[in-house]
């Protein structure tokens, strides 16, 4: 049922790309931020049944995600209709172009695979964590919610550099291309470094948003501090992935993602879990980052 409802929010990705293609990335930031904030607000309400809402447990987290994505999609549709003058949304005279569809999939399939790899990684890691305690799974879920706020501006900048790099690559303007790549890498590293310090300084405050139990607080504090150590490296890697996408070579990012998440991270997490201490499992993220 949750999967069926969530498919209704899928158009948000197409809607956001329409805004990106015309340089209106500020609206993408607004839609994604709004969706993430609503998700975080609705999580405890639906999980624990606050304010008269039904107590849904784990399913509540899924429905909170669906609700946030749906609001983001509707907001993105509004921006396209009211603000995106270059794009007219209409099915009148609509006719598929197989050549265009082929070009889209040549670039899009690696991204599809990378998204799938991420889902497989999360599923596999949850299977490892649940052998310790379900609280560990909850802590991992809390981390993913929190890290979205740190990664969001970097992914937004990544979306912004793609058309700039692609345009200057086509125009053979190497000076501007190199300058864009340099500045993107610097800003990505700086933003993620700030995020690392936040996760190190106030993990208890961040986890408090999830009404964390003492056990979740202990597990989550160590988790946030260890995983955030590689945030600066991730900032650079995300920007590099944007360069590959702009040059039509996103397949390289796909290879890196597969190696990092499936060949390195999951096996490392599995073997580290055999040491009997859940804190060691988070070190797998540090090891895997060297293969990003």
Role assignments for model-derived ranges:
Residues 1-9, 55-109, 165-230, 271-292:
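Short alpha-helical transmembrane segments in multi-pass integral membrane proteins
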Residues 7-20, 28-36, 61-75, 155-158, ...:
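Short runs within selected transmembrane alpha-helices of multi-pass transporters and secretion channels
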Residues 12-28, 139-197, 201-203, 234-256:
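Small-residue-rich hydrophobic transmembrane alpha-helices
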Residues 17, 44, 111, 163, ...:
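Small-residue-mediated transmembrane helix hinge/kink sites in multi-pass secondary transporters
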Residues 35, 68-72, 76, 80, ...:
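Transmembrane helical elements of multi-pass membrane transporters/channels
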Residues 39-44, 73-77, 149-152, 196, ...:
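Hydrophobic transmembrane alpha-helices of multi-pass small-molecule transporters
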Residues 43, 47, 76-80, 126, ...:
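Structural signal for membrane-spanning alpha-helices in multi-pass inner-membrane proteins
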Residues 45-56, 116-143, 149, 167-168, ...:
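Helix-terminus/linker motif at the lipid-water interface of multi-pass membrane proteins
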